[in-house]
Amino acid sequence: MFPAVCLVSCLSVATPSFAAIDLMPKDVTVDAHAMTVQVVNNGDRPEYVSISLSRLLNPGVPLDDERLEPVSDAARPSLYAFPFRMSLAPGQTKTLTLKPLHPVDTETVYRLDVKPVVKVLGAEKKATSASVVVNLAFSGLVRQLPARQREALSVECDELGARVAATGNVRYRVEGAKVDGRALDAFNVYPGAPLPVNGKVVAIPGHPACHGRTGN
């Protein structure tokens, strides 16, 4: 059985096959100080983009299974991104700022979405509204870290194999794990987001092997 754990590629930057807009860097770590990201227009036409930041509620899962909470909906957000909108000429680069508002107790992961927006006026201009077409969006990854960081992992055996959980306050990178003798790619486990690893025999370095219900 293929292990249910999401490998490291599951929590990555979401990019279309081609996009005029780019982010540098695409993976950002924020501590107590503000960080900046460069938004680049690689296209040959002006771009108007909207920017949103959302907390990832279940980091470590496949991209399609991610659950997001917009920071704008939070009563007391810990991180803020500004500006919300910007216009970029062809080849232009502008700076986006990520500012921590409050310290976090555990590592918190966000999606930073930059969406190009094109206004379409049509044959008749309407004063009250305008049609809007949204091009392919670009999504970066932001990790906000606590001041004091602890890495720890627990492994709980169950009838399907094992369940791994980060018991520290930051992500734990699991390397060298095997399922039924087959090596897994390295993967991250995040605090508050345990992952199942299914198989007859699940071996996580530093922990006793787990045997699924079909194992001995």
Model regions: which residues?
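Intrinsically disordered, low-complexity regulatory regions in eukaryotic proteins
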Residues: A19-A89, T93-V109, D113-N216
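N-terminal signal peptide c-region/cleavage motif recognized by signal peptidases
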Residues: S9, A14-P16
